[in-house]
Amino acid sequence: KWGVFIMLMGEFHHNLDEKGRLIIPSKFRNELGEKYVITKGLDKCLFVYSLSNFEKIVNKLSTLQFTRKNVRAFERSFIGSASLNEFDKQGRINITSPLVHYANITKECVIIGALERLEIWSLEDYNKYMKENEEDLASIAEDIFNMNYEA
């Protein structure tokens, strides 16, 4: 942990077993803590949050007007698919069938740290996404770091 801020970074490849379990590297487990929340992410991957970081998102969502169509749609997908879990003794997480289907996971997975969350991708979708976006990374970085960012 970096102060009060969780710092998840790195890329790992593991296989989903026949019971829907996936080994999460110990460096990620140590940052997330005993309990985690897994849910549908964006771009057809899964997001994994520490309980405290998920609570921050829920608190933010609770301030939004549920009468807005986009708010309801996001809550249904993001909150509706979320589940609170604990790592098993082997450091694995359980991924439910609906989440496996959503993320197109068959067996091979890529687990990446993305600051305050993990992303779990099917290997095929991750490679496709990275290939499609690699040429845009320079302009994306320029846009991000020109948004009132001071190092």
Labelled PLM ranges:
Residues K1-H14, E18-K19, K27-N85, K89, ...:
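Flexible "stalk/tail and boundary" regions
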